[in-house]
């Protein structure tokens, strides 16, 4: 049984926290996840372990899930993690332009499982439903970048979720803060899956891979390639990532329970295994477990 440290999981409970997009259909969320009407309103550790039972999960990276009160949600997740035998590292939500950023980081610092923060930076110039940032230019905004100074003081890593056309702005940021670890989510989120889109995505990722303080997460396959994705379709993209970042900076994640709207945990991880079957056992262990476990280790 393969040992796994899942690099991207959402655990939540609509009775404990408010997730508006789960109470009423949200067109923006639907634009990336498709029809999510069957997504559960409660998904806890035991639900995840049932879904992943065919694999030996040693730990997970819990990601905030668009709650109305991110601090309340983080405290709830901390309690959930403490009550479980499963190691749980946490990535929480911030706004780097928030005047109260320092206060929020102080609060997060009291939660031992919090190892990273993220802000939703995605801005699709061609689709107004996929504009999750305040503005399209945050990565180049000097005031926004100053928020990273506060992050550095607290020792948190920084999650980066954006769309592939924004990738070219990222290396300037990661080079400016070489002592902050940056995690690029959703494979750099390619929007254009055509041959020319692939070429541009690979070019921009290759530049970013030269920054040793960046790791990349391979997850949310269903959001990129659709609910009916095929292994043959996703393999070149995944293998390109590993070629550029190497096994020690590449990590697999499930994106459960959203992945459950597609093929589910077992078939997803089976596909991952088939795609990287030619790598050595040590290299596979890095991608499935060791990279995420080390990158998201407790502060």
Model-inferred region functions:
Residues 3-16, 133, 142-143, 147, ...:
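A generic "structured core" feature
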Residues 134-251:
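Catalytic pocket-lining loop regions of alpha/beta-barrel enzymes
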Residues 2-7, 14-51, 59, 239-240, ...:
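Mid-to-C-terminal alpha-helical segments outside catalytic/metal-binding sites
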Residues 8, 60, 90, 117, ...:
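Conserved, mostly hydrophobic/aromatic
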Residues 27-41, 47-68, 87-95, 115-122, ...:
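Divalent metal-dependent hydrolysis catalytic cores, especially in the metallo-beta-lactamase
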Residues 47-51, 73-80, 101-108, 143-150, ...:
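A general structural detector for well-ordered alpha-helical segments in enzyme core domains, enriched
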Residues 39, 66-72, 94-102, 162-168, ...:
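Acidic-and-aromatic substrate-binding clefts and catalytic sites of carbohydrate-active enzymes
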Residues 72-164, 217-221, 228:
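Active-site gating/metal-coordination segments in enzymes
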């Amino acid at each position: 049984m393969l040992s796994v440290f899942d690099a991207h999981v959402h655990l939540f409970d609509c009775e404990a926290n408010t997730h508006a997009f789960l109470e009423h259909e949200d067109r923006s969320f639907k634009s990336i996840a498709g029809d999510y009407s069957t997504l559960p309103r409660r998904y806890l550790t035991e639900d995840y372990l049932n879904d992943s039972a065919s694999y030996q999960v040693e730990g997970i990276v819990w990601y905030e899930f668009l709650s109305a009160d991110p601090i309340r949600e983080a405290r709830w997740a901390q309690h959930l993690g403490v009550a479980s035998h499963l190691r749980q590292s946490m990535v929480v939500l911030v706004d780097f332009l928030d005047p109260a950023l320092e206060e929020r980081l102080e609060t997060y610092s009291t939660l031992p499982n919090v190892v990273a923060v993220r802000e939703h930076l995605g801005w699709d110039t061609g689709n107004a439903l996929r504009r999750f940032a305040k503005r399209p230019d945050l990565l180049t905004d000097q005031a926004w970048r100053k928020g990273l100074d506060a992050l550095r003081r607290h020792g948190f890593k920084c999650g980066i979720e954006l769309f592939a056309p924004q990738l070219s702005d990222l290396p300037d940021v990661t080079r400016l803060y070489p002592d902050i670890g940056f995690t690029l989510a959703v494979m750099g989120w390619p929007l254009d899956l055509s041959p020319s889109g692939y070429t541009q995505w690979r070019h921009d990722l290759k530049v970013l891979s030269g920054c040793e303080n960046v790791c990349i997460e391979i997850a949310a396959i269903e959001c990129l390639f659709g609910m009916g994705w095929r292994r043959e379709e996703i393999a070149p993209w995944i293998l390109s990532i590993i070629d550029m970042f190497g096994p020690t900076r590449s990590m697999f994640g499930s994106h459960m329970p959203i992945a459950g709207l597609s093929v589910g945990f077992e078939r997803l991880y089976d596909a991952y295994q088939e795609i990287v079957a030619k790598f050595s056992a040590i290299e596979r262990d890095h991608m499935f477990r060791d990279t995420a476990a080390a990158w998201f280790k407790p502060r």
